Amino acid sequence: MPIAQLYILDGRSNEQKETLIREVSEAMSRSLDAPIERVRVIITEMPKNHFGIGGEPASKLNR
């Protein structure tokens, strides 16, 4: 059972997350020749002040 664990910053809509799950699942199924029903996707959302880019929190970088 292939599992993808994705970390994203807060702020995406449910529709965007559904699209992400669908497209990652399709890509994994295709590239690994695995039935899509066996693919799992886990999304972990983080507050922007919990993620650093270049030594600064993403919240300060307007990301």
Swiss-Prot record:
Pathway, per record: Aromatic compound metabolism; salicylate degradation
Reaction catalyzed: (2Z,4E)-2-hydroxyhexa-2,4-dienedioate = (3E)-2-oxohex-3-enedioate
Superkingdom of the organism of origin: Bacteria
Family: Belongs to the 4-oxalocrotonate tautomerase family.
Keywords for this protein: Aromatic hydrocarbons catabolism, Isomerase, Plasmid
Organism of derivation: Pseudomonas fluorescens
The protein's name: 2-hydroxymuconate tautomerase
Function comment: Catalyzes the ketonization of 2-hydroxymuconate stereoselectively to yield 2-oxo-3-hexenedioate.
CDD domains: 4Oxalocrotonate_Tautomerase
Active site location: 2
Pfam families recorded: Tautomerase
Quaternary context: Homohexamer.
Enzyme class label: isomerase
Enzyme Commission no: 5.3.2.6
NCBIfam families documented for this protein: PRK02220.1 (NF002571), taut (TIGR00013)
One GO-annotated biological process of the protein: salicylic acid catabolic process
Gene Ontology molecular function: isomerase activity
